[in-house]
Amino acid sequence: AASDVYKRQELFNSSRPREYDGSHIQFTGMTPEITLMPHQKNAVAHILYGNNTLLAHCVGAGKTFQMIAAGMESRRLGLSQKNLYVVPNHLTEQWGSDFLRLYPGANVLVATKKDFEPANRKKFCSRIATGDYDAIIIGHSQFEKIPISQERQERLLREQIDEIAVGIEEMERENGERFTIKRMEATRKSLEARLEKLKADEKKDDVVTFEELGVDRLFIDESHYYKNLFLFTKMRNVGGIAQTEAM
């Protein structure tokens, strides 16, 4: 009997990834001169209903239009109020042009090099925070100049320190490699130093943080540029596991 139950589970119990169908989406405001392909509509549905989404399509599959359409539908449906698109620096103007080609009536704010110069950065970030835009488009390096709040930085650092401390205890209990433990201890000390420096720094009231922008949906073009950032793990010398240390 137990064998029959096992066979039944093998035959009939299974998990299947959810499939997203975007054929019903009307795309209000999109130019009638452009019609999205079925796979593009399905990708938009995935973004709208699937939360975090990776568009791992090949070059030329239309990922730009997918993200643009997803952002506009998200605003129309009330799923987001302020969409931020972070793209390679040399493509900000091209993205702005593509956005208006697909949605001619869209209100789009495109950052220029001057907007993120020290003298202009606060003013531009204030425009993002107070403006009612369908989309804000900025470059990767510009995005990296917008700090997250000190409170969030401290919380993230404390979480990483706690995770590493637990990992060290487990490695010592399991008689793990001393070299690995030393690296973990060095990483913890580095994070603790960052935390102390952060706590010692006076908060700059004239700096607009990411939280203050009001962005509630984020699109990253060419997101592979952000691969292999620091991630705590006890695994070492394993293909695909980032080896970078905490900055």
What are these regions (language model features)?
Residues 2-6:
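Short, small-residue-biased leader/transition segments that mark boundaries at the very start
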Residues 15-56:
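Conserved pre-motif I regulatory segment
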Residues 24-34, 63-64, 75-219, 225-229, ...:
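SF2 helicase/translocase NTPase motor core
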Residues 39-46, 66-70, 123:
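Well-ordered alpha-helical segments embedded in enzymatic catalytic cores
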Residues 50-71, 82:
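Walker A/P-loop
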